[in-house]
Amino acid sequence: MVNYTVKNWQGEEAGTGTLELKTAKPETAKHLIHRVVVSHLAAARQGNASSKTRSEVRGGGRKPWRQKGTGRARAGSIRSPLWRGGGVIFGPKPRDFEVKVNRKEKRLALRTALISQADNFIVVESFAEQFSQPKTKELTAALSRWGASPEEKILLILTEIPENVYLSGRNICNLKIIRADSLNVYDVILADRVIATAAALAKIEEVYGA
């Protein structure tokens, strides 16, 4: 269980709350999070790297010279992997890098990652109504008022991402905005500071709660 203070748009205390999520045992937490992160990064790979073997390279069907009598090393094809322009031995072929992790494990890892970031958590009130139009300067100033440094990697968790908020934040290089129901372990543990609205935390408990 994590107790937190809710801040308003001006950065002043506006309330308190608690976040209750079931986490992994300390002795297995690190291994579990590692597995889920590996799975997440593997799933992001395109896996379409492809090279040609000697049988796929154009040409090379004719024997370059006769087997015996020339004094040269025997050769059967100009596309041998030993030759320039030849095929590739054990080169990459299109493949699926998926590492299967059970959904229960993913959710447990995510809850554990969130609780592990408790010291870096900032909870704020919903602020979508503050952006009648995109304004990067306003969002940057708000992040500073809430206690986040511009040099920190910031993960901003919202229930919904209004267009004006998205447009205001997309040019802030260290900021990533994500929906509460689309969280992943990698983004959570990569962040130096996790900022979430109180409504987003309620959504997290609803979606990922044990």
Swiss-Prot record:
Organism: Microcystis aeruginosa (strain NIES-843 / IAM M-2473)
Gene Ontology molecular functions: rRNA binding; structural constituent of ribosome
Any Gene Ontology CC annotation: ribosome
Biological process according to GO: translation
Gene3D superfamilies in UniProt: 3.40.1370.10
Cystine residue pairs: none
InterPro entries assigned to the protein according to its UniProt record, in alphabetical order: Ribosomal_uL4, Ribosomal_uL4-like, Ribosomal_uL4_dom_sf
Protein name: Large ribosomal subunit protein uL4
Region Disordered, residue ranges: 44-77
Quaternary structure and interacting proteins, as annotated: Part of the 50S ribosomal subunit.
Signal peptide: none
UniProt keyword terms in alphabetical order: Ribonucleoprotein, Ribosomal protein, RNA-binding, rRNA-binding
Role this protein plays: One of the primary rRNA binding proteins, this protein initially binds near the 5'-end of the 23S rRNA. It is important during the early stages of 50S assembly. It makes multiple contacts with different domains of the 23S rRNA in the assembled 50S subunit and ribosome.
Gene behind the chain: rplD
Lineage: Bacteria, Bacillati, Cyanobacteriota, Cyanophyceae, Oscillatoriophycideae
